[in-house]
Regions:
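Class I S-adenosyl-L-methionine-dependent methyltransferase catalytic core
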Residues: 1-178
Length: 178
């Protein structure tokens, strides 16, 4: 895994082998970031199930102002810290906690939110409900959902899907406030 473009282009990212997780592959990440490019510059990013920090770090490389990288797994947090330190990124906050607690307590608004939980979970629907309940998405912001099953990407009537893509065993849906 590596950073595919921007100021950190070509920098290697460490991954990990934790059951139920799988990082977004470089070719899928490249396609995704081509789609969301107009939302990245100067954005405040929340990568809620950050894993290795892959998506949040890519957003920072492509011009995001600040990123919050969240994961509840300590192995993921250690990997994120290693990746951030190896690249020398400073405009990032790494949070080791459960997504529900983070969404309740963070009290920020985001321009770009990544929801890429482990495939064996059903966290997307609850995450979207909490993002809406706590009003965490800026009016022009987007939520990027990734899952192995399109049926797991369930959202309230306050959001609409503006784009969806299928890449092998991955479904990516972009949501925007209505």
């Amino acid at each position: 895994m590596k950073v595919i473009s921007g100021k950190y282009k070509g920098r290697k990212l460490d991954g990990f082998d934790i059951d139920g997780t799988r990082p977004t592959m470089d070719r899928v990440k490249e396609s995704l970031f081509a789609i969301i490019q107009n939302y990245i510059s100067e954005s405040i990013v929340l990568d809620l199930f950050a894993g290795s920090g892959n998506l949040g770090i890519e957003a920072l490389s492509e011009g995001a102002k600040y990123a919050y990288l969240v994961d509840k797994n300590i192995k993921c947090i250690k990997t994120i810290k290693k990746n951030v330190n190896n690249i020398g990124i400073e405009n990032v906050k790494i949070i080791h906690n459960d997504y529900r607690k983070v969404l309740k307590d963070i009290n920020k608004k985001f321009d770009l939110i990544f929801l890429d939980p482990p495939y064996k979970t059903n966290c997307i629907e609850e995450s979207i409900k909490l993002i809406d309940e706590y009003n965490l998405l800026n009016d022009n912001g987007i939520i990027v959902c990734e899952s192995d099953n399109l049926d797991k990407i369930v959202y309230t009537d306050k959001f609409s899907a503006i784009r969806d893509r299928h890449y092998g065993d991955k479904y990516i849906v972009l949501l925007k406030k209505i």
